[in-house]
């Protein structure tokens, strides 16, 4: 007897599917790319069952294609997510997620004494991994923070 499976989230004709986002991170990714203000249809799956993660989040954005730079920002939130570009219901491209070397003007420095809070400068962080933990180092105050501390703000 064949095992019957059914999609829990409807397929899209054209656009981007971001899958294997850790549970509870999907909304942050939605806001990172400003998708919640898009006029395109966005399908969100939260806390979906996953054999690899236990639970996962999923985003499907119609008629929007994420570029390599955006995919590298996504790697800060969900380094093992998959990004598929869909055309006519078929996967035409898979983007590999790689941590960016640096990230500018996306996050605020958690250090309240950092000059970036009082001066008209763009925030800037060097991104690196230490013992499999993602770390960000502020360009201005040179303090090092875990990914979670920076992305929670």
Curated annotation (Swiss-Prot):
GO terms for biological process: 'de novo' pyrimidine nucleobase biosynthetic process; pyrimidine nucleotide biosynthetic process. The keyword Transcription regulation does not apply. Binds 1 zinc ion per subunit. Signal peptide: none annotated. GO terms for molecular function: metal ion binding. SUPFAM superfamilies: Aspartate carbamoyltransferase, Regulatory-chain, C-terminal domain, Aspartate carbamoyltransferase, Regulatory-chain, N-terminal domain. InterPro entries: Asp_carbamoyltransf_reg_N (IPR020545), Asp_carbamoylTrfase_reg (IPR002801), Asp_carbamoyltrfase_reg_C (IPR020542), Asp_carbatrfase_reg_C_sf (IPR036792), Asp_carbatrfase_reg_N_sf (IPR036793). Keywords: Metal-binding, Pyrimidine biosynthesis, Zinc. Contains catalytic and regulatory chains. This is Aspartate carbamoyltransferase regulatory chain. It comes from Vibrio parahaemolyticus serotype O3:K6 (strain RIMD 2210633).
